[in-house]
Every structure is written in C-alpha cells, then in structure tokens.
C-alpha cells in the first residue's frame, strides 16, 4: 500500500480552533488517522498555539505520526508556506506517497453558515470519503478533488484535494509572497473578481495538467457557496 501523508495548513485566524477540532475529529472517526503514515500540521502562526492545542487532545501518538511543522509565523502568506513545504517533501522523497491536503477553510468568513456548509462538503468528500480518493489515485489519477472548474484556470474550487507525490514534485514553486510588487500581481491568470495573488494557491495543483478525478460536485461556480446554503442532505447520498 502506498504511504499516505496529510498536509494540514493551519493558522491563527478567528475560529481556527473550532474548525481544527472538526477536522481532527473526522481524521480520527473515519479511520484515516490509522491509515496514514504522517499528519503534518503545518503551523502558520505562533508554534505554541498549536502545541497547546495538540496537548489538549491527550492523544496517543506512540507511532510518531503527528508532526508539528513551523512553516511560517505570518498568516498573511495564506497557503503558500504549506504548499511549498509539501513541494519540498515530494521532491526529496525516496519513494512515492499519496498526499491529502486540507486547510481551515472559511476563517476569513468564520460564522457564516453558507461557508460552513461549503467546508462541511469538502470535509465530507476529502476526509470522510478518503478511501474513494485513495482508490482513484491507486487507479491512475494524479489528482482528486471536488468542483473541478476551468475558469480562470483549471482548479478544484475550495482547494481541498488528494494527489500523487510524483506529480506534485513536477510542479513549479509558487513565487514568494514578498516577491509580489502588489496584491494584483499573480503568477497565473488573474481571478476575475479578486486579483489577489493568494488565488495562485488554488491554480497551482493543475498547472501541469494532471490526470484528475472529480469525486463530487456541489454548487457551481464555487462562489455560490458564499451566497447559498448547502446542507448535507444535498450530497450525502452522492457516493
């Protein structure tokens, strides 16, 4: 069986602990924790915040799966530090592994029930349905996710996904946030409604045209999730 490594981008924006608790519970209750080889908690903030969080769980990690990785202290870098740490790990690996990538979706709009529904949907497809993601990768897919769109670039809306490390290792690095002259400079085609460089993080995975599987689909385009509710009853029967 191919090794599995979770890369979990976490930061200290308001509501972080509630979202992190939710995802942690799913990682444990679905059996994913037992299946993975590593859970890389990629800390984008003060390390002691997440050290204290992990200690509060009183979890037995005798196998040493949980790795607290201090990728950066500035949440303004968004997902860049974790994605670049993942790229480094993929390139340095001596054998291939499957990547599960998640983050604390929706903290900038924490408390918005619409965004909470979107996060719940992606948690369901990425964490609860982890076996389906692994099966797709084992069958030849290089990337698996939800809500595949091609505008303004190919991407999985929301940016939760699984991928093969061999494919990720071929991706080009994303430009460092400090290299940006201003927020409207982007490495990929500008997002039509928000030209901020953080959308490069969503465009990155598909920049080398992977063989992909769309595991599930919800509201289209993804921005509708900011305006509409999407309860679990809309999708729990899909797979």
Predicted regions and their residues:
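ER/Golgi luminal nucleotide-sugar-dependent glycosyltransferases, focusing on the catalytic module
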Residues: 1-239
